């Protein structure tokens, strides 16, 4: 079956649509000449200056300015003094929004990703955003990479996603906790957490 690389137009759409449509797609990153990556199974949407959980809530800064640029570029930031978070910018230029990649089912370069993470179980490789970035070897040095390029990309192998669930986002406290903007594939072992009130995405659109 033909594998199709996602174009910039895929990301230049409403963030909730992009987040849901990214589930089941395959993220590929070239790390030291080796192909690493896997199937995306968990994502969160962060949308504009009206979203209190979004980095752009208080306006444009040197840290978040890439969110105001064109869709389809990496926004990577360092948090909690230990973790890098991997996001893909969405929507039109000038409107700050992004999708946080929270969980990935490993496919390519599994041994290297285990080594990067220092783990032995495949389900411990990328079941969380910080774990995922570390497994891939992605840091703030990769901030600004074009996701439609050759170093990092997302492809569609036309496989249907399993049941999709949505919930409130993780680790944001009360900031936007009413928004069910976390999307994940039901019962997938590479999802970070499932102990949250869930809903069906059909009720959102």
Predicted feature descriptions by range:
Residues 1-205:
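Conserved, well-structured core segments that form or line functional sites
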């Amino acid at each position: 079956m033909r594998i199709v690389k996602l174009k910039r137009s895929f990301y230049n759409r409403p963030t909730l649509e992009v987040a849901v449509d990214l589930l089941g797609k395959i993220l590929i990153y070239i790390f030291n000449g080796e192909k690493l990556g896997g199937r995306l199974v968990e994502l969160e949407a962060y949308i504009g200056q009206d979203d209190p959980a979004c980095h752009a809530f208080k306006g444009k800064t040197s840290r978040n300015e890439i969110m105001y640029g064109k869709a389809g570029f990496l926004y990577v930031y360092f948090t909690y003094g230990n973790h890098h978070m991997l996001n893909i910018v969405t929507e039109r230029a000038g409107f700050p929004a992004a999708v946080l990649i929270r969980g990935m089912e490993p496919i390519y370069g599994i041994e290297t990703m285990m080594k990067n993470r220092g783990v032995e179980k495949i389900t411990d490789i990328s079941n969380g955003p910080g774990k995922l970035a570390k497994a891939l070897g992605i840091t703030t040095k990769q901030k600004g990479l074009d996701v439609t390029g050759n170093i990092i990309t997302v492809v569609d192998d036309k496989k249907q996603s399993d049941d999709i669930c949505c919930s409130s986002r993780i680790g944001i406290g009360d900031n936007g906790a009413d928004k069910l903007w976390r999307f994940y594939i039901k019962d997938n072992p590479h999802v970070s957490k499932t102990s949250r009130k869930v809903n069906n995405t059909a009720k959102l659109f």
